Amino acid sequence: MKFFQEKISIKETNILLKVDNPKFFKMAKNTIINERLNLENYILRNPIFLTSYSPVEVPDNAPEIIKLMAEAGFNADVGPMAAVAGTFSQLIIENLIENDCKNAISENGGDICLKCEMDTTVGLYAGNSSLSGNLGFKLKKEKMKNGYGICTSSGTVGHSVSLGNADSITVFSKSAIIADAAATSIGNFAVGNAVDAINKCLEKAETISKIDGVFVCMGEHAGKIGKIPQLIKTDKKEVLGNVFEMV
Protein backbone atom coordinates (compact mmCIF):
# COMPACT_ATOMS: atom_id res chain seq x y z
CA MET A 1 0.00 0.00 0.00
CA LYS A 2 1.57 3.27 -1.12
CA PHE A 3 0.95 6.42 0.88
CA PHE A 4 1.45 10.00 -0.26
CA GLN A 5 2.48 12.43 2.46
CA GLU A 6 2.24 16.19 2.78
CA LYS A 7 2.64 18.67 5.61
CA ILE A 8 -0.13 21.26 5.52
CA SER A 9 0.40 24.43 7.55
CA ILE A 10 -2.28 27.11 7.64
CA LYS A 11 -1.76 29.64 10.43
CA GLU A 12 -1.63 27.66 13.71
CA THR A 13 -2.91 24.46 12.10
CA ASN A 14 -0.09 22.07 11.20
CA ILE A 15 -1.25 18.78 9.72
CA LEU A 16 0.80 15.80 8.64
CA LEU A 17 -1.50 14.05 6.19
CA LYS A 18 -0.99 10.64 4.60
CA VAL A 19 -3.44 9.51 1.92
CA ASP A 20 -3.70 6.85 -0.78
CA ASN A 21 -4.25 9.43 -3.54
CA PRO A 22 -2.62 12.88 -3.77
CA LYS A 23 -5.87 14.43 -5.03
CA PHE A 24 -7.06 14.45 -1.41
CA PHE A 25 -4.49 17.04 -0.31
CA LYS A 26 -6.45 19.89 -1.89
CA MET A 27 -9.66 18.71 -0.25
CA ALA A 28 -7.94 18.65 3.13
CA LYS A 29 -6.60 22.17 2.65
CA ASN A 30 -10.06 23.44 1.76
CA THR A 31 -11.49 21.79 4.86
CA ILE A 32 -8.89 23.52 7.06
CA ILE A 33 -9.46 26.92 5.44
CA ASN A 34 -13.25 26.71 5.70
CA GLU A 35 -13.32 25.40 9.26
CA ARG A 36 -10.69 27.87 10.47
CA LEU A 37 -12.84 30.66 9.06
CA ASN A 38 -15.85 29.36 11.00
CA LEU A 39 -13.79 29.09 14.17
CA GLU A 40 -12.07 32.47 13.86
CA ASN A 41 -15.27 34.34 13.07
CA TYR A 42 -17.02 32.80 16.05
CA ILE A 43 -14.13 33.67 18.39
CA LEU A 44 -14.17 37.29 17.19
CA ARG A 45 -17.75 37.57 18.46
CA ASN A 46 -17.27 35.26 21.45
CA PRO A 47 -13.68 35.56 22.77
CA ILE A 48 -14.48 33.48 25.86
CA PHE A 49 -14.54 30.45 23.55
CA LEU A 50 -10.80 30.94 22.98
CA THR A 51 -9.69 31.67 26.53
CA SER A 52 -11.91 29.60 28.82
CA TYR A 53 -10.43 26.62 30.68
CA SER A 54 -13.99 25.53 31.54
CA PRO A 55 -16.81 24.29 29.30
CA VAL A 56 -18.62 26.98 27.31
CA GLU A 57 -22.28 27.00 26.27
CA VAL A 58 -22.88 27.73 22.59
CA PRO A 59 -26.14 28.40 20.72
CA ASP A 60 -27.84 25.83 18.51
CA ASN A 61 -27.17 27.97 15.44
CA ALA A 62 -23.39 28.04 16.02
CA PRO A 63 -21.18 26.51 13.29
CA GLU A 64 -20.79 22.75 13.53
CA ILE A 65 -17.11 22.96 14.48
CA ILE A 66 -18.05 25.18 17.43
CA LYS A 67 -20.75 22.79 18.65
CA LEU A 68 -18.45 19.78 18.35
CA MET A 69 -15.67 21.45 20.34
CA ALA A 70 -18.11 22.69 22.98
CA GLU A 71 -19.60 19.21 23.36
CA ALA A 72 -16.13 17.71 23.84
CA GLY A 73 -15.34 20.36 26.44
CA PHE A 74 -18.43 19.51 28.47
CA ASN A 75 -17.74 15.79 28.13
CA ALA A 76 -14.26 16.19 29.65
CA ASP A 77 -14.86 19.29 31.82
CA VAL A 78 -12.35 21.50 30.00
CA GLY A 79 -12.48 24.54 27.73
CA PRO A 80 -13.50 23.94 24.11
CA MET A 81 -10.09 24.86 22.69
CA ALA A 82 -8.70 21.74 24.38
CA ALA A 83 -10.24 19.86 21.46
CA VAL A 84 -9.10 22.09 18.60
CA ALA A 85 -6.27 19.94 17.20
CA GLY A 86 -8.27 16.72 17.27
CA THR A 87 -11.21 18.54 15.73
CA PHE A 88 -9.27 19.50 12.61
CA SER A 89 -7.89 15.96 12.24
CA GLN A 90 -11.40 14.56 12.62
CA LEU A 91 -13.08 16.95 10.17
CA ILE A 92 -10.40 16.33 7.55
CA ILE A 93 -10.86 12.56 7.72
CA GLU A 94 -14.66 12.84 7.69
CA ASN A 95 -14.49 14.98 4.55
CA LEU A 96 -12.10 12.57 2.84
CA ILE A 97 -14.29 9.58 3.70
CA GLU A 98 -17.28 11.39 2.15
CA ASN A 99 -15.18 11.72 -1.01
CA ASP A 100 -14.39 7.98 -1.13
CA CYS A 101 -10.90 8.09 0.36
CA LYS A 102 -10.07 4.57 1.55
CA ASN A 103 -6.88 5.20 3.53
CA ALA A 104 -5.97 8.43 5.31
CA ILE A 105 -4.09 9.47 8.44
CA SER A 106 -4.30 13.02 9.76
CA GLU A 107 -1.92 13.99 12.59
CA ASN A 108 -2.09 17.40 14.23
CA GLY A 109 0.47 17.82 17.01
CA GLY A 110 -0.02 14.30 18.34
CA ASP A 111 -3.77 14.25 17.77
CA ILE A 112 -4.64 11.67 15.16
CA CYS A 113 -7.69 10.61 13.22
CA LEU A 114 -7.26 7.77 10.76
CA LYS A 115 -9.21 5.55 8.42
CA CYS A 116 -7.35 2.57 6.98
CA GLU A 117 -8.41 -0.62 5.24
CA MET A 118 -5.62 -2.67 6.81
CA ASP A 119 -4.24 -3.10 10.30
CA THR A 120 -2.09 -0.13 11.26
CA THR A 121 0.50 0.56 13.95
CA VAL A 122 0.76 4.01 15.51
CA GLY A 123 3.94 4.66 17.50
CA LEU A 124 4.08 6.20 20.96
CA TYR A 125 6.04 9.42 21.47
CA ALA A 126 6.49 10.27 25.14
CA GLY A 127 9.40 12.69 25.30
CA ASN A 128 12.35 11.44 27.32
CA SER A 129 10.52 8.43 28.71
CA SER A 130 12.28 5.14 28.02
CA LEU A 131 9.02 3.90 26.49
CA SER A 132 9.03 6.61 23.83
CA GLY A 133 9.66 5.21 20.37
CA ASN A 134 9.73 1.65 21.70
CA LEU A 135 6.00 0.99 21.89
CA GLY A 136 3.24 1.16 19.34
CA PHE A 137 -0.50 0.57 19.25
CA LYS A 138 -1.74 -1.92 16.66
CA LEU A 139 -5.17 -0.96 15.38
CA LYS A 140 -7.41 -3.44 13.61
CA LYS A 141 -8.89 -2.31 10.31
CA GLU A 142 -12.42 -2.96 11.60
CA LYS A 143 -11.88 -0.34 14.31
CA MET A 144 -11.02 2.33 11.74
CA LYS A 145 -13.81 1.67 9.24
CA ASN A 146 -15.51 5.01 9.91
CA GLY A 147 -12.44 6.82 11.24
CA TYR A 148 -10.86 6.55 14.69
CA GLY A 149 -9.24 8.96 17.11
CA ILE A 150 -5.94 8.60 18.98
CA CYS A 151 -5.00 11.78 20.83
CA THR A 152 -2.03 12.47 23.08
CA SER A 153 -1.48 15.22 25.63
CA SER A 154 1.83 15.87 27.39
CA GLY A 155 3.04 18.03 30.23
CA THR A 156 6.67 17.66 29.14
CA VAL A 157 6.51 17.84 25.33
CA GLY A 158 5.16 20.56 23.04
CA HIS A 159 3.52 23.93 23.63
CA SER A 160 -0.02 22.89 24.52
CA VAL A 161 -1.27 23.84 27.98
CA SER A 162 -1.27 21.02 30.55
CA LEU A 163 -1.48 21.44 34.31
CA GLY A 164 0.20 18.07 34.89
CA ASN A 165 3.60 16.63 34.07
CA ALA A 166 2.92 13.28 32.43
CA ASP A 167 5.11 12.42 29.45
CA SER A 168 2.05 11.26 27.55
CA ILE A 169 -1.67 10.69 28.02
CA THR A 170 -3.04 8.81 25.01
CA VAL A 171 -6.80 8.52 24.65
CA PHE A 172 -8.63 6.23 22.22
CA SER A 173 -12.11 7.06 20.96
CA LYS A 174 -14.31 6.87 17.88
CA SER A 175 -14.03 10.67 17.90
CA ALA A 176 -10.68 12.46 17.82
CA ILE A 177 -12.54 15.54 19.07
CA ILE A 178 -13.70 13.76 22.22
CA ALA A 179 -10.28 12.09 22.62
CA ASP A 180 -8.36 15.37 22.40
CA ALA A 181 -10.38 17.12 25.10
CA ALA A 182 -10.26 14.01 27.28
CA ALA A 183 -6.46 13.75 26.98
CA THR A 184 -6.07 17.34 28.15
CA SER A 185 -8.47 16.84 31.05
CA ILE A 186 -6.81 13.62 32.23
CA GLY A 187 -3.34 15.11 31.85
CA ASN A 188 -4.20 17.89 34.29
CA PHE A 189 -4.30 15.27 37.06
CA ALA A 190 -0.73 14.05 36.48
CA VAL A 191 0.78 15.61 39.60
CA GLY A 192 2.96 14.09 42.31
CA ASN A 193 5.23 11.06 41.99
CA ALA A 194 4.82 8.91 38.90
CA VAL A 195 2.79 6.08 40.44
CA ASP A 196 0.40 8.42 42.26
CA ALA A 197 0.06 10.67 39.21
CA ILE A 198 -0.77 7.77 36.92
CA ASN A 199 -3.40 6.49 39.34
CA LYS A 200 -4.98 9.97 39.54
CA CYS A 201 -5.10 10.11 35.75
CA LEU A 202 -6.74 6.71 35.47
CA GLU A 203 -9.30 7.64 38.13
CA LYS A 204 -10.17 10.78 36.17
CA ALA A 205 -10.42 8.76 32.95
CA GLU A 206 -13.13 6.61 34.55
CA THR A 207 -15.35 9.70 34.87
CA ILE A 208 -15.19 10.62 31.16
CA SER A 209 -17.69 9.10 28.74
CA LYS A 210 -17.39 8.32 25.02
CA ILE A 211 -13.77 7.09 25.24
CA ASP A 212 -12.59 3.50 24.75
CA GLY A 213 -9.41 3.53 26.79
CA VAL A 214 -6.42 5.50 28.06
CA PHE A 215 -2.67 4.83 28.23
CA VAL A 216 -0.60 6.99 30.61
CA CYS A 217 3.20 7.21 30.48
CA MET A 218 5.35 8.99 33.06
CA GLY A 219 9.08 8.35 33.21
CA GLU A 220 9.67 4.61 33.57
CA HIS A 221 6.07 3.96 34.59
CA ALA A 222 2.87 3.42 32.63
CA GLY A 223 -0.73 2.47 33.24
CA LYS A 224 -3.89 1.87 31.27
CA ILE A 225 -7.62 1.69 31.70
CA GLY A 226 -10.40 0.57 29.40
CA LYS A 227 -9.89 -1.01 26.00
CA ILE A 228 -6.76 0.07 24.14
CA PRO A 229 -5.26 -1.43 20.97
CA GLN A 230 -2.66 -4.18 21.26
CA LEU A 231 0.69 -2.87 22.47
CA ILE A 232 3.65 -3.94 20.37
CA LYS A 233 7.38 -3.21 20.38
CA THR A 234 8.48 -0.82 17.63
CA ASP A 235 12.19 -0.08 18.26
CA LYS A 236 11.81 3.26 16.49
CA LYS A 237 13.02 6.53 18.00
CA GLU A 238 10.82 8.77 15.88
CA VAL A 239 8.16 11.32 16.58
CA LEU A 240 4.69 9.87 16.78
CA GLY A 241 3.56 11.38 13.51
CA ASN A 242 6.25 9.53 11.57
CA VAL A 243 5.63 6.09 13.05
CA PHE A 244 2.84 4.67 10.93
CA GLU A 245 3.16 1.16 9.60
CA MET A 246 0.74 -0.84 7.53
CA VAL A 247 0.93 -4.46 8.70
Swiss-Prot record:
InterPro entries: ApbE-like_sf (IPR003374), MA1715-like (IPR037456), UPF0280 (IPR007183). Belongs to the UPF0280 family. This is UPF0280 protein MMP1236.
